[in-house]
Regions:
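Divalent metal-dependent hydrolysis catalytic cores, especially in the metallo-beta-lactamase
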Residues: 62, 78-107, 120-133, 160-171, ...
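Active-site core of metal-dependent hydrolases
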Residues: 158-283
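Active-site gating loops and adjacent loop-to-helix segments of metal-dependent hydrolytic enzymes
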Residues: 82-93, 133-160, 203-244, 284-309, ...
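His/Asp/Glu-enriched, well-ordered alpha-helical/loop segment
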Residues: 229-247, 263-275, 280-366
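Alpha-helical scaffold segments that flank or form the walls of functional sites
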Residues: 50-52, 59, 69-121, 143-159, ...
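A conserved glycine-rich beta-strand in the N-terminal activation segment of trypsin-fold
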Residues: 15-24
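Conserved, mostly hydrophobic/aromatic
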Residues: 127, 182, 212, 323, ...
């Protein structure tokens, strides 16, 4: 079946295109063209002058719709995924906070079942813990944090083909070996919940830690010890040009001014936007976080003792609005940081992330307030308030 989207401002890799068409055939993009003549037999969609952009790739998200991926059940996974898809997420990496091995194994089984389904939005599993620095635990369960142990992580990796990313603090004993092993297995090791200094960050980068989890959160910046000043993890990451970062762009985890600074230094190709959302995101009624220590206050998730932020209640469309409306980032770049850049970081840019011939038919229509009006995921409409 052919679908032709016309009369929109289309975001292509070369920039904005007006008076063109995005043509979908089944689950693929057949063509993006500057011709808007109606195709005989195609389902014609009038974008009404709105923005036609690639679907968002959520590379760090813990839940939504009242359910958490840490539950590990198929029902929880499906509910959370569907909740985020309504707001522009067309591909997703379900994320687990620090967990026990049985919890990881349960989530792996569920993730692999869903990935095997036709046109699945699930691209793989992301483990945020549990090889973290306990001094930077944040909202992670402290009793589950430990040093990397090859007797534990090797069997997990060997039995988890869905595992695409695993975070760790590079300064912890055994972390460099862990990062090198993950990189060799095609799993992205990412720096997270860390007190790493420059030497630690550089050693991690050389071992395969090429990405940084929720940049600025749960890591130190510039600081002083007695009368002397030292760089923190943040400055160390800025000094490594090829290291990519992700930022929670809800306008709360990172101030808009810092969001803009990160964009100016790292650039659109090395900076992704994430929600780091918990179960309460896109949820109805009085939904609660999976972790009983978490409360919702001031539009964000916090530990009940207010010692740390615990995650967001954001969806992908909010990331775009925050970047544009609060951080003064051009819309095209804000969208790219939710689509093209995550695809590049996770190694799926050959089939995701941009509106180009042959890529998966993941398309959004955004109105002038940057609200989602229509979502196609693999060619199927999953949200529509446009027609």
């Amino acid at each position: 079946m052919l679908t032709q989207i016309v009369n929109g401002k289309i975001l292509t890799p070369q920039g904005w295109m007006k008076n063109g068409s995005v043509i979908l055939r089944d689950n693929k993009i057949l063509e993006v063209t500057n011709c808007d003549l109606a195709i005989i037999g195609a389902n014609l969609v009038d974008a009404r002058g709105m923005y036609v952009v690639p679907g968002c790739i959520e590379m760090h998200v813990h839940g939504g719709g009242g359910r958490d991926f840490q539950e590990g059940t198929e029902e929880a996974f499906r509910t959370a995924i569907q909740a985020h898809m309504k707001y522009g997420t067309t591909s997703i990496y379900p994320t687990l906070s620090s967990s026990t091995v049985p919890m990881i194994q349960k989530a792996v089984r569920t993730c692999e079942r869903l990935m095997c389904e036709p046109n699945s939005p699930v691209l793989g599993l992301h483990l945020e813990g549990h090889y973290l620095n306990p001094r930077k635990a944040g909202a992670q369960m402290p009793e589950w944090i430990k040093n990397p142990d090859p007797n534990e992580y090797i069997p997990i990796v060997e039995n988890s083909p869905c595992l695409k990313r695993w975070d760790a603090a590079p300064e912890m004993p055994g972390a460099i070996q862990f990062g090198r092993y993950c990189a060799e297995k095609g799993i992205l090791p990412s720096i997270a919940h860390t007190a790493a200094e420059y030497e630690d960050v550089m050693a991690g980068f050389k071992a395969g830690f090429t990405h940084v989890t929720h940049f600025y959160n749960a890591m130190p910046g510039f600081h002083q010890k007695r009368e002397y000043k030292y760089e923190g993890t943040v400055e160390s990451v800025y000094l490594i040009d090829d290291m990519t970062v992700e930022v929670v762009a809800d306008g709360i985890h990172v101030p808009p001014t810092i969001l803009r600074m990160c964009y100016k230094i790292k650039g659109v190709e090395r900076m992704a936007l994430i929600t780091d959302a918990l179960a309460v995101a896109a949820a109805e009624g009085d939904a609660q976080a999976f972790d009983s220590r978490v409360v919702i206050e001031d539009g964000v998730c916090k530990l009940s003792d207010r010692s740390a932020l615990a995650g967001s209640i954001a969806t992908s469309d909010r990331l775009i609005r925050t970047a544009v409306q609060m951080a003064d980032i051009p819309l095209a770049d804000a969208v790219r940081m939710c689509s093209e850049t995550p695809a590049r970081i996770m190694g799926v840019l050959d089939r995701k992330g941009t509106l180009e011939h042959g890529k998966d038919a993941d398309v959004l229509i955004l109105d002038d307030k940057l609200k989602v009006r229509c979502v196609w995921a693999m060619g199927e409409i999953v949200e529509n308030t446009l027609f």
